[in-house]
Amino acid sequence: MYLAQIKAELQEAADVLDKFMSDEKNIQLIQDAALLISNSFKQGGKVLSCGNGGSHCDAMHFAEELTGRYRENRPGYPAIAISDVSHLSCVSNDFGYEYVFSRYLEAVGQKGDVLFGLSTSGNSKNVLNAIKVAKEKGMKVIAMTGKDGGQMAGLADVEIRVPHFRYADRTQEIHIKVIHILMMLIEFEMAKQA
């Protein structure tokens, strides 16, 4: 009944991944992002992650695998997903949703920390505001975007962009793959110092 559609969906997902992988720059950027985060941890820094909708879930997933574990039993790494419901509702009510992430960074972000911001469009106002505050505080910024990078293009120290223009879900599929690779590389890199 739906076999052709299922195969078409899987094929499109594979095609987007193949296109992403065929650009060597993307492979280098993933390594750069992993080293940036690992170096922050080695210097006593932390990573703060944020995004909206599915990207918010990916930001939480990234943080929990840093504080918990990915594949290896090892010490937890300092990571916070900006996802506290009381904070989000307070700032949304008192200042506006576009400030939910930047306000948190104003409170806890420090020089040497890393902001890991996700936006499939690259145009999420609250992530853009977080990038601005992170830069003002001397933090490093990793952006995971899609399409043409949107307004986030060129703002991050490392931008990993999935140049897919049809649907956000294809971009998110690559984002979660990249997150898992980052976890693997961070565990490799941090094990060197253990």
Swiss-Prot record:
One of its GO terms (molecular function) is zinc ion binding. GO terms for biological process: carbohydrate metabolic process; D-glycero-D-manno-heptose 7-phosphate biosynthetic process. Residues 37-194 form the SIS domain. It is found in: Cytoplasm. Gene3D superfamilies: Glucose-6-phosphate isomerase like protein, domain 1 (3.40.50.10490). Homotetramer. This is Phosphoheptose isomerase.
